[in-house]
Amino acid sequence: MNEAETIRYHAAHNGRPAELDLLDQTKLPGTLTRLVCTTIDQTHDAIQRLVVRGAPAIGIAAAYGVTLTPVDAESNSSLPEAQARYRQTIDYLATSRPTAVNLFWALDRMRAIVDDFSGPVAELRERLVTEAIRIHDDDRQMCRSIGCHGATLLADCKSVMTHCNAGSLATSMWGTALAPMYHLHESGHSLEVFADETRPLLQGARLTAWELHQAGIPVTVCTDSMSGSLMRQGRVDAVIVGADRIAANGDVANKIGTYPLAVLAKYHNIPFYVAAPTNTFDSELESGDLIPIEQRSADEVSYPCGTDSPRQTPEGVAVVNPAFDVTPAELVTALITEKGVISEPDTAKVRAHLGL
């Protein structure tokens, strides 16, 4: 069994409760440990604390989390009562992180199962487990497809830069932004990856560098402020990142620091690619200005090594810590999805790609 597998699920069996088994990414790269959730509160906390993170992964985790709803199929609970409890769980898990639309997409799929069901209560849980597994399996196929489409754009590159972590740790398999790198690596194509550290939580330095190194893909960590210098030196052939939400016009919400990276890439005439599944698109939002941006604790900036370590900002000084920023579509060379590539995205192209 792969100990680095991001998400596992163990169905209830012989009186043993169902378990959502997560790789604890807050402990990487120093410690490889897992966190087992058996309640919806534990699942909510794991998503909120970034034990599991990455837009596709939190959607999968939330879907499995719905199945942990305490509904006793052997009791006299009526179907309407059970449905009400599942809906309550879905609403609760939706509050764990506000920006990643994959979370709401996965929970909407689970809600549809609850709303449309008309059989025994015990069978409803089975249907929900089946749907969560299907969401997990769909994500694996998405990773393969994005890897294939993205590889065609990076085939002539010798080095690429990426931001945050949009790899296997953020999904069920290869990831989104890192999927083309895995695809090319399997094909024997040598590609160096610059992983910028991604402050304040260092997902690039801690997670992307770790998983690529584990896979044998050459990776070099650089500070966030070093990116422009590397581009000016001609050491970066392309930039590729993931996304947590994409508006109808192609504007992209991704980890804070993505927007300045896109500006730098534009200035240096370097392609800037965004890789994300179609369920990351929010066609109801006309532009990125409408995307809700999660504001996280100031402690993540003031105590970068944890609150038990020395404070790195002066006491009493204000700290701003948005988790995401928005990159305008005009800075995006192409969007890469499991369906293909949207070059120079705009509203018309996005709608056509999504079949709207």
Curated annotation (Swiss-Prot):
It comes from the Bacteria. Gene3D superfamilies: translation initiation factor eif-2b, domain 1, Translation initiation factor eif-2b, domain 2. Keywords: Amino-acid biosynthesis, Isomerase, Methionine biosynthesis. It is an enzyme of class 5 (isomerase). It catalyses: 5-(methylsulfanyl)-alpha-D-ribose 1-phosphate = 5-(methylsulfanyl)-D-ribulose 1-phosphate. Pathway: Amino-acid biosynthesis; L-methionine biosynthesis via salvage pathway; L-methionine from S-methyl-5-thio-alpha-D-ribose 1-phosphate: step 1/6. Signal peptide: none annotated. The record marks 164 as: Transition state stabilizer. Substrate binds at residues 53-55, 97, 203, 254-255. The active site is at 244 (proton donor). GO terms for molecular function: S-methyl-5-thioribose-1-phosphate isomerase activity. The keyword Isomerase applies. One of its GO terms (biological process) is L-methionine salvage from methylthioadenosine. Its EC number is 5.3.1.23. The keyword GTP-binding does not apply. Catalyzes the interconversion of methylthioribose-1-phosphate (MTR-1-P) into methylthioribulose-1-phosphate (MTRu-1-P). HAMAP family: Salvage_MtnA. Belongs to the eIF-2B alpha/beta/delta subunits family. MtnA subfamily. This is Methylthioribose-1-phosphate isomerase. The gene is mtnA.
